Amino acid sequence: MKSYFFILVWITSTIHSFGYEAMHEKTPVGTIKILNLPKRTALEASSKVSYFDENNGLFRKLFRYISANDIAMTTPVEADITPGKMRFFVGAEDLEKKFTDSNEVKIKSVPTIKVVAIGIRGGYTKARFLENEGKLYHWLSENQKFEKAGETYGVYWNGPFIPGLLKRSEIHLPIQKKQNPKKKNQK
């Protein structure tokens, strides 16, 4: 019975990974590391409520948009938590296509960014987000080279139909190098 379970897990996770262009590599589960993310074109849906209160509504808005405009799905998607926003990224093959804002989706240019990231396994819950966000803030408090440069956001690698125990995600905290403090008595 155990072997059937592991075969099912392997098949489900393998099938899900086919066909999607990855915008960057996954951060290994439990690992905290610095990533330099490139400039990207995003499709963004927003809500007045928290991402965790949206019940996949943001995902559905974006999915309808990419389906209507024949844009390939990429992974991961990003989500600002409060207020809720979700971003799909446009892959290399679709960048030349002409697409415009809709009532539900806005096109955004996302600049290059340096983040500290933590890899996570499990369902996409507020409790899991807050627990791992705390680990990033602890890392930042222990690291004297960097300071916060923006708000944390979720990075989700799997769609809503993948079982929670198979899901992978990350939390990113934008950072920048600390400015050298001016020395007293320096002219």
PLM region descriptions:
Residues 2-187:
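A solvent-exposed interaction/effector surface
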